[in-house]
Design a protein with these regions (language model features):
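Metal-dependent peptidase/peptidase-like ectodomains
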Residues: 52-155, 160
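Residue-level preference for long, well-ordered alpha-helices that form the structural scaffold
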Residues: 18-21, 25, 52, 104, ...
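Conserved beta-strand elements of the Class I
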Residues: 4-5, 77
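Short acidic/His/Gly/Ser-rich catalytic and metal-binding motifs that mark active-site loops
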Residues: 13-15, 87-90, 163-167
Length: 181
C-alpha cells in the first residue's frame, strides 16, 4: 500500500516557547487528521510529529534512516508543515520548500492559480493572485531527509521574508493569527 506522510516538528529552539515554530504546524497536522479521518483515499496517510528538527532534523533523519528500501518505495510523498501562523498585514503567503528549484522563477503566480483552482472552496479564499507564493529550495526542515533519499518531499512554510517571530522569546501565541492554521 502506498503512503503519503503529513508531518510537523513539535520541538522548539532553546529560548523559545515554540507557539508558531512549530505549534502551528502541529495544530495543522492534527486538524488535517481530524478532517481526513473518514475520507476514502486510495493510499494511506501517515500523520507524523517529529522531534529534533531544531537540532538538524534528528527525528526525521532517524525515521528515514530506519526505513527499508521497500518502505521508501511505498512513500508517494511527504508534506511537512512548519511555522504557518504569524500575524501579518501582508496577507496570506506560502513558501513551498522542496529539494529542487524550479527553472521558471522565484515567484510562481501560475502555481498559485493552479492551487486556487484545485480547491475553490477554501484555498482560493486564502491565496489570491495579489498574494505571494514561493517555490524555493531548502534544506532546513523535516522534508529534507526524505528528499535526500529521493522521496518527493516539500515543506509548507509562511513567507520568511515577513520577519517572523521565531526561535526566541517572541514566538508566543500573542504574535500568532490562529485563523491561518
Amino acid at each position: 500500500t502506498k503512503n503519503l506522510i503529513i508531518s510537523a516538528h513539535y520541538d522548539s529552539a532553546e529560548d523559545s516557547v515554540g507557539a508558531n515554530d512549530n505549534g502551528s504546524g502541529v495544530a495543522a497536522v492534527l486538524e488535517l487528521a481530524r478532517i481526513l479521518k473518514d475520507t476514502e483515499i486510495p493510499y494511506n496517510i501517515k500523520f507524523i510529529l517529529f522531534s529534533g528538527e531544531e537540532k538538524y532534523m534528528l527525528g526525521s533523519r532517524w525515521y528515514v534512516g530506519k526505513l527499508t528500501e521497500d518502505e521508501r518505495k511505498q512513500i508517494i510523498g511527504v508534506i511537512n508543515i512548519d511555522t504557518i501562523a504569524e500575524k501579518s498585514d501582508l496577507g496570506y503567503m506560502a513558501m513551498i520548500e522542496g529539494n529542487k528549484r524550479p527553472d521558471n522563477a522565484e515567484y510562481d503566480d501560475e502555481g498559485l492559480k493552479k492551487l486556487a483552482e484545485l480547491n475553490k472552496n477554501s484555498m482560493s479564499e486564502l491565496f489570491t493572485p495579489s498574494d505571494r507564493f514561493f517555490l524555493t529550495m531548502a534544506t532546513n526542515s523535516d522534508h529534507y531527509p526524505f528528499a535526500l533519499v529521493n522521496i518527493p518531499a516539500v515543506s509548507i512554510v509562511q513567507d520568511w521574508q515577513d520577519g517572523l517571530n521565531v526561535n526566541d522569546s517572541s514566538d508566543v501565541k500573542e504574535n500568532m493569527d490562529i485563523q491561518r492554521i
